[in-house]
């Protein structure tokens, strides 16, 4: 896995976490 892909995955996890908190 390349560095760019890792950043994208981290962004997705962060967005998903925020959405869960918002309900």
From Swiss-Prot:
Q: Which GO terms describe its molecular function?
A: toxin activity
Main subcellular location of this protein, as a coarse class:
secreted
Where found in the cell?
Secreted; Nematocyst
Q: Does the keyword Secreted apply?
A: yes
- Write out the entry's keywords from A to Z: Nematocyst, Secreted, Toxin
UniProt entry tagged with the keyword Secreted: yes
List all membrane-crossing ranges. Answer: none
**What residue stretch is flagged as signal peptide?**
none
User: What cellular component GO annotations does this protein have?
Assistant: extracellular region; nematocyst
Q: What does this protein do?
A: Nephrotoxin. When injected intravenously in rats, causes severe destructive glomerular changes. At 24 hours post-injection partial disruption of the glomerular basement membrane, massive thrombus formation in glomerular capillaries, severe mesangiolysis and infiltrating cells were observed in the majority of glomeruli.
Protein name per Swiss-Prot or TrEMBL? Nephrotoxin PsTX-115
To which species is this protein native? Phyllodiscus semoni
Phylogenetic classification of the source organism: Eukaryota, Metazoa, Cnidaria, Anthozoa, Hexacorallia
């Amino acid at each position: 896995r390349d560095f760019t892909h890792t950043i994208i995955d981290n962004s997705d996890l962060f967005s998903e976490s925020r959405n869960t908190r918002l309900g």
